[in-house]
């Protein structure tokens, strides 16, 4: 597939910004939506708009089928053993909080510890802090190496017989560095600890086989994968889910209810209380199918690799710029670049480049502990997707140079 052909599936890319062609480079925050996903959203919302799992009439049956067919698709996509291991949520943040409130509340207590990575997004830090405040457990911080990936040798010192859970991202949303998850999982399991992997960035760029990778928990968001907002997924091993108490109480997650006793539904519905976001969840299927197609397409893969090499080399060659995680090299990273420009505030850079038609993220990236490690309050981030072109990468570097010249 040609990149131009792929771009036609994303009408949002064709718009202008301040009279210039939009160069959208905030894909790590959220991707643009593909037409196929929006068509499904429109179809379900107009033609099959009925609550799922509750009624026998035709519209409800059709809505339920669309919802549950999506679960089957996600199970196959991740190579999970069972559809019961796929929980739909609103996003990665909700998924991680679900694990903290269920697995955490039941299995983690005073005297136990949780290992959390230094470069994690706040959504994989704060839920564990709150859990430790409630239970008296301890958080241990797994540092990054000078390259920006997690320090496996330090992990061997941190994980002990009291470690119940290790929480790490597949790929940092700031550094773009691919972490040594296989080693982390293998060592953690050898000590009896479970592992939660934040796949918010990883699921976008890497094919995932949860059985082969032996993840205990895996969380990601469809809105970064061409689907609608509100399309979160939590994968968890069935044997863990069976032992975990419900997170929220209400409709759908019950077996029977009386004032004397309530029993709970079978998996996965025990963790899907209330009316689900039934009109957007089905957008996961066409969106993730398209994403998989891009990962398997040689021409599109080569295009992203070319972008990665070009931008990496250009940033590393400029002595005015510090590329966070640059020491990891180009081979162990995705095309996500967080930069610090000496003497220039990241917000000013973002504002100037916005007027040039380049959409970038600025700020602390919801990773303040990592900002502290880097010695800054914020950065400027450019993140590329399969529909971005090498010409857009060149435009990014050209506009960045112009913006720096204006601001210095």
Predicted regions and their residues:
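Pyridoxal 5′-phosphate
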Residues: 1-408
């Amino acid at each position: 597939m040609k990149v131009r052909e792929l771009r036609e599936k994303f009408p949002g890319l064709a718009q202008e910004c301040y009279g210039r062609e939009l160069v959208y480079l905030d894909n790590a925050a959220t991707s643009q939506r593909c037409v196929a996903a929006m068509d499904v959203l429109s179809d379900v919302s107009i033609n099959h708009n009925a609550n799922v799992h509750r009624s026998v009439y035709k519209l409800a049956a059709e809505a339920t089928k669309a919802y549950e067919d999506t679960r089957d698709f996600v199970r196959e996509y991740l190579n999970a053993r069972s559809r019961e291991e796929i929980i739909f949520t609103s996003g990665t943040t909700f998924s991680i909080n679900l694990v903290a409130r269920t697995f955490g509340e039941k299995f983690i207590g005073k005297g136990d510890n949780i290992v959390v990575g230094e470069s994690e997004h706040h959504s994989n830090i704060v839920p564990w802090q709150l859990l430790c405040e409630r239970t008296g457990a301890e958080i241990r911080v797994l540092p990054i190496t000078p390259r920006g990936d997690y320090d496996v040798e330090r992990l061997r010192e941190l994980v002990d017989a009291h470690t119940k859970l290790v929480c790490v991202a597949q790929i940092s949303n700031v550094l773009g560095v691919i972490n040594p998850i296989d080693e982390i999982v293998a060592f953690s399991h050898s000590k009896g600890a479970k592992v939660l992997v934040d796949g918010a960035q990883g699921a976008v760029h890497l094919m995932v086989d949860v059985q082969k990778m032996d993840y205990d928990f895996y969380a990601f968001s469809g809105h970064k994968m061409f689907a609608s907002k509100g399309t979160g997924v939590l994968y968890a091993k069935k044997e863990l889910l069976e032992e975990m108490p419900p997170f929220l109480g209400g409709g759908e997650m019950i077996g029977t209810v009386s004032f004397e006793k309530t029993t709970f539904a079978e998996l996965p519905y025990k963790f899907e209380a209330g009316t689900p976001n039934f009109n957007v969840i089905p957008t996961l299927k066409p969106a993730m199918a398209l994403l998989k197609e891009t990962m398997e397409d040689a021409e599109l893969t080569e295009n992203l690799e070319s972008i990665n090499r070009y931008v990496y080399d250009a940033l590393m060659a400029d002595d005015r710029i510090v590329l966070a995680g640059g020491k990891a090299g180009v081979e162990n990273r995705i095309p996500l670049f967080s930069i610090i420009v000496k003497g220039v505030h990241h917000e000013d850079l973002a504002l100037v480049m916005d007027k040039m038609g380049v959409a970038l993220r600025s700020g602390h990236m919801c990773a303040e502990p990592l900002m502290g490690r880097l010695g800054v309050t914020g950065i400027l981030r450019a993140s590329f997707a399969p529909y971005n072109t090498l010409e857009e990468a060149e435009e990014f570097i050209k506009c960045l140079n112009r913006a720096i010249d204006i601001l210095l």
